[in-house]
Amino acid sequence: METDEFFTIKEKDLLFSLYRKLLQLSGETLQKGDCKKLKTHLVNTIQNNRIQRDIFGLNPVIKDMQTAVIVAEEIGMKRASILGLMLHDSVRCGTCTALEVEQIYGEDVAGIIRGLIRVNELYSKSPTIESENFRNLLLTFAEDMRVILIMIADRVNIMRQIKDCKNDEARRQAVSYTHLRAHE
């Protein structure tokens, strides 16, 4: 498993801490083998250099795990939402397909992944549009309210991670979050 360059020493510690917390929060809803299969998907995605740090330098696996903790702990969502969140980058970058995810984890997980990918594609095209049409389009694209809740949790996580960042991109992200939040 050659993921050493992908995670800093600090991130490795954080990764194990988040893993334990997430397992504690969702362990009873996970099916046998979910964690092992998820790890295999993530390692494969990392080893194939399919995901990279974002504009803030945040590690996408750590960011998704932090968001998954918010989803589980603060919103109360369980297996399908957590797995969908953790696997959506692997599907988006082509390491695996939504059909494979559906066969391994079920339609519920695959549906959340499809929703996250669709909403993220829409959102990346126009993240700060304030119109009522965009709000309606976003909700229509999501099809599943869990997708919107996961996106809100993701924005909350990003806001927490970049609170001390002074650059313009951080401010744009903050504005983007407020618009998404206002749409709810």
Q: Predicted segment positions?
A:
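Histidine/acidic-rich helix-loop-helix segments that form or flank divalent-metal centers
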Residues: 108-152, 163-173
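Conserved small/polar residues in nucleotide/adenosyl-binding loops
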Residues: 178-184
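Generic start-of-chain signal for non-secretory N-termini
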Residues: 1-37
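Alpha-helical phosphate/pyrophosphate-handling elements in metalloenzyme active cores
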Residues: 44, 49-86, 94-96
